[in-house]
Swiss-Prot record:
It catalyses: 7-phospho-2-dehydro-3-deoxy-D-arabino-heptonate = 3-dehydroquinate + phosphate. Pathway: Metabolic intermediate biosynthesis; chorismate biosynthesis; chorismate from D-erythrose 4-phosphate and phosphoenolpyruvate: step 2/7. Its cofactor is Co(2+); Zn(2+); NAD(+). This is 3-dehydroquinate synthase.
Length: 359
């Protein structure tokens, strides 16, 4: 078993990674302090893993809530359902929430944990590749608003992240590919050697080879933990984790949440960011081609929707959380393995990239 730690003083927490972790009760129960637990999951994950988790928690008073599946349900209405479920059964501050599912479940349950009675503990049990390598670690919790993604939320750290790589065996191929976008992101912004490893080992990952999966997930979590330890609330280096997300969030908001998976939109966004960097002279043509080829090898889109023009992108991008003093700030790669935040990308530069980057 791989065991990492996010070092945040009194709020530090472990990340545990292995195949078959959800067969062992002690892994899940070690950070639960009270006697009451509420598991929140969705209609896809519940038939696969809910009963198993309930059995692991045989010594606790366990309730569960099953939500609809999909990004379309990452809303204030879903958040309110969780609040109502907790209130109706008189849960207190000693209750532990368990987020059993992918990124949507993790984000909305984390936000509920941050908000209920001003904060109760929660545990992340991510079941998708995207949530295992990215969204379950770092304490970003949120719901979407019709005008923007993740606009309502909080920084609130889990008590524990339990990553069972066996869960990926039940993940649809499209969802696996979407998760690979975040894996590739870490190589682009932080670790050129990891990027090269991905170029060589993509087929092993797609074949779900246990050793390859364990290494990739661990490396992503190591990078994420390092970044979060340095900059928990995203005032500096953590912003680099948003590579592709400014363009990507615009695609998601414009096309309707869930029509493009988050990872698919981020992949197209990373290609647009890389193209912007190449046009500015910060990325050479060979590096741009390597990024494009790796995204394609992962079965990810490299172009934005054909019917999404400059005005649609800009309308959403101006609402991005990285906008500062009215200036749009973009994360752009500087070679492979490094990235920077820039605030001087002109509308003409964006127009050129958007027009050339559509299907």
């Amino acid at each position: 078993m791989e065991r990492l730690k996010v070092e945040l003083g009194e709020r530090s927490y472990p990340i545990e990674i292995a195949a078959g972790l959800l067969q062992h009760a002690e892994v899940l129960t070690q950070t639960i302090k009270g006697k009451r637990v509420m598991i929140v999951t969705n209609t896809v994950v519940a038939p696969l893993y809910l009963e198993r988790i309930i059995q692991l928690l045989s010594g606790f008073q366990v309730e569960h809530l099953i939500l609809p599946d999909g990004e379309a349900y990452k809303t204030l209405a879903t958040f309110e359902r969780i609040m109502s479920a907790l209130l109706e059964t008189n849960h207190g501050r000693d209750t532990t929430l368990i987020a059993l599912g992918g990124g949507v479940i993790g984000d909305v349950v984390g936000f509920a944990a941050a908000s209920y009675q001003r904060g109760i503990p929660f545990i992340q049990v991510p079941t998708t590749l995207l949530s295992q390598v990215d969204s379950s670690v770092g304490g970003k919790t949120a719901v979407n608003h019709p005008l923007g993604k993740n606009m309502i939320g909080a920084f609130y750290q889990p008590k524990h992240v339990v990553i069972d790589t066996e869960c990926l065996k039940t993940l649809p191929a499209r969802e696996f590919a979407a998760g690979m976008a975040e894996v590739i992101k870490y190589g682009i912004i932080w670790d050129a050697e990891f990027f090269s490893w991905l170029e060589t080992n993509m087929s092993r990952l797609q074949a779900l080879e246990p050793a390859a999966l364990a290494y990739a997930i661990r490396r992503c979590c190591e990078i994420k933990a390092d970044v979060v330890t340095q900059d928990e609330t995203e005032h500096g280096v953590r912003a680099l984790l948003n590579l592709g997300h400014t363009f990507g969030h615009a695609i998601e908001a414009e096309k309707g949440y869930g029509n493009w998976l988050h990872g698919e939109a981020v992949a197209a966004g990373m290609m647009m960011a890389a193209s912007t960097a190449e046009a500015r002279g910060d990325l050479d043509a060979r590096q741009l081609a390597r990024i494009r080829d790796l995204l394609l090898a992962a079965n990810l889109p490299i172009q934005a929707p054909a019917d999404m023009d400059f005005s649609a992108f800009i309308r959403h991008m101006r609402r991005d959380k990285k906008v500062l003093e009215g200036k749009l700030r973009l994360v752009l790669p500087v070679g492979i393995g490094h990235a920077q935040v820039v605030a001087d990308v002109s509308d003409d530069e964006l127009l050129a990239v958007i027009e050339s980057g559509r299907e």
